[in-house]
From Swiss-Prot:
Gene3D superfamilies: mk0293 like domain, Transcriptional regulatory protein pf0864 domain like. This is Pyridinium-3,5-bisthiocarboxylic acid mononucleotide nickel insertion protein. Its EC number is 4.99.1.12. Belongs to the LarC family. Keywords: Lyase, Nickel. It comes from Staphylococcus epidermidis (strain ATCC 35984 / DSM 28319 / BCRC 17069 / CCUG 31568 / BM 3577 / RP62A).
Amino acid sequence: MTKALYLDCHAGIAGDMLLSALVDLGAHPEDIESELKKLPLDQFKLHFQKRVKQGIHAMTLNIDVKESNHHRHVNDIFKMIDDSTLPERVKYRSKKIFEIIGQAEAKIHGMSFEEVHFHEVGAMDSIIDIIGGCIALEQLGINTLYCSAIPTGHGKIHIAHGIYPIPAPATAEILKGIPIAHFDVQSELTTPTGAAFAKGLVSSFGPFPSATIQHIGYGAGSKDFNFPNILRVIQFDSEFEQQDSVQVIECQIDDMTPEALGDFMNNALEQGALDAYYTPIFMKKSRPSTQLTLICKLHDKIYFEQLILQETSSLGVRSTSVNRKILNRAFKILSTQHGTVSIKFGLQNGKIMKMKPEYEDLKKMAKTTNQPFQVIHNEVLQQLYQTYRIGDILQ
């Protein structure tokens, strides 16, 4: 059994809404503030209070801060987190969210990741939202997060670089591959920080899974509308495998180069395909050929069928809806002599069925220590199997 959290983003998601909802769920604001004040930040005070939003009693957050208004680089924020005494999983989750926002800003502004100035993100309130939210998740013992489709709103927004359409450029970049919900509201409903929380920490998107609800928290946004501007978070104990349906799209291709096939696969995965792979086959006239198989969410069926017809030489596709069963997933941080690595667990009835270190973490660790990847991989696996055992209940 593992603690899981569902983010019901019917009115969007922002960092302050999530932190407020987690406090309403049961996280202790005094402990969150105490942990945050261990960081080298300007003086601040958190004020959580209840407000009524269109009949819904929800928690809100106001931050009193004396800010020096200096911009922070991503490495400044990473160093601040690394040098802190925060729990390892809080460090990992926080850095992952900042990295997602930084990568989006770097791409939009045409600069390297290290050159990114964190304007809004570097501001005190955003640092508090991100790190405070990860502290609250740790307090509540949340291992796995799920999320609904996310509405963005529409219209125009004033940001540091001028007037931009909604979703803001960084938000749109972050939300690539994430299902978007239509909500006809002329306002920004989802911020880059909220989008990065979902992108970085959520295991899967869709309707609420079959489960027994344990607790519910409500976090209110700062704007008032004719609907409840709230984020609802639902805590439940995840005991059984997930079951859902996905779309399998296939076609045969015998006249594309390997380079073109590779480019299409990369593009499809970037656009949100769950998986894509090629199988060598023989077609009529004994021609060596390739079968493309693409797996996506049901609601993405039309989009990926069109993508295949536009970007491959195929004249048609076959599409089938299939059921799938998935082990519950949970993540924990493993501390090693070379640094920390995220471990992905596959669980059934709370028992460990599968476990593996995240490849990207191992790759970074090998690069940082200047050691062969296989050496790092073997050392981490050895420590992993000394710490956890297949069949044990994940604590």
